[in-house]
Amino acid sequence: MIACDAHMHTRFSEDSDASVHSMLDAAVNKGMQAVCITDHLDKDFPETPDFPAGAFMFDLDEYFSRLTQLKTEYQKKLEVRIGVEIGLQPHLGEYYKELTEKYPFDFVIGSIHLIHGQDPYYRGFFEGRSDEEAYHEAFQVAIENLKKINSFDSLGHLDY
C-alpha cells in the first residue's frame, strides 16, 4: 500500500498557515511515499465571518515555481505532486477549463464550497428553511456544477 495524502493545504490557502516545507517534512517523518498539495483556489468566494472576499485566490505562477522547486528538493525522500482544490460554481466552468489547460496540475479536486453564493459551513445558509430544503438546494447545485464543469479529477465536499 502506498501512503499518500492528496488533500493538503499550505500558506497558499487562506485557511492554512503551514509552510510547504513543514508539510513535506511532516509527510516524510510519517513515512509517507507521496503527497499532493491542493491549495484552495475559489474564484468569486464571498466575504464570510472568517475570510474577506476573494481570500481563496493566489498567484499560480508562484505556486508552480515553488512546488516545482520542492519536487526536485524532495525527490529522493517523497513524491511531491502539484494539485489544486477549485471551488465549483456553475458560472465558472469556462474559467476553470482555461485554468486547468494552462497549468499542468497532477490532480484537481473540484469542491462545492458555495450554494448560490452562500457557504453552507455557516448557519445562515439554513435560516428561513428546513434542513431538508437546504440540503435539497445544495444537491441541486451540486448536480448543476457537475453538468457544467468537468475540469477536475475528484469531487470534494459533496455533503460538506
Regions found by a protein language model. Name each.
Residues L67-L70, Y95-E98, Q140-K148:
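Short, charged beta->alpha transition segments
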